[in-house]
């Protein structure tokens, strides 16, 4: 899964740099960090709702949405996956 996350993070970073027309990532960035942060919250709630009443496939789908929007927010903050990985390792000690 890490390879997929790193690949997706790279694509997100590129879209944020280039801001191509028609890019969903670019459209999120244009709406600002506050909007993206709210999307992360919305997607987190959707994961919770799915886990309580909508079944496994829906949980997987909503989790993918959550991870994508979280990666966009992290990129907008200039936070790398390596930084998050390091923090998780620190917490495992």
From Swiss-Prot:
Gene Ontology MF, one: ATP binding
Intracellular or extracellular location(s): Cytoplasm
Any single biological process term in GO: L-histidine biosynthetic process
Keyword Metal-binding among record annotations: no
Entry's Gene Ontology cellular component terms: cytoplasm
Protein name per the record: Phosphoribosyl-ATP pyrophosphatase
Enzyme class: hydrolase
Pathway as given in its UniProt record: Amino-acid biosynthesis; L-histidine biosynthesis; L-histidine from 5-phospho-alpha-D-ribose 1-diphosphate: step 2/9
Xref: InterPro entries: HisE, PRib-ATP_PPHydrolase-like
Catalytic activity entry: 1-(5-phospho-beta-D-ribosyl)-ATP + H2O = 1-(5-phospho-beta-D-ribosyl)-5'-AMP + diphosphate + H(+)
Family: Belongs to the PRA-PH family.
Residues spanning the membrane: none
Record keywords: Amino-acid biosynthesis, ATP-binding, Cytoplasm, Histidine biosynthesis, Hydrolase, Nucleotide-binding
E.C. code: 3.6.1.31
């Amino acid at each position: 899964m890490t390879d997929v996350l790193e690949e997706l993070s790279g694509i997100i970073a590129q879209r944020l740099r280039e801001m191509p027309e028609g890019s969903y990532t670019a459209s999120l960035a244009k709406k600002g960090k506050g909007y993206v942060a709210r999307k992360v919250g919305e997607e987190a709630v959707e994961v919770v709702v799915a886990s309580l009443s909508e079944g496994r496939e829906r949980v997987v789908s909503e989790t993918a949405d959550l991870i994508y929007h979280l990666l966009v927010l992290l990129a907008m903050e200039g936070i790398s996956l390596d930084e998050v990985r390091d923090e998780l390792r620190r917490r495992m000690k």
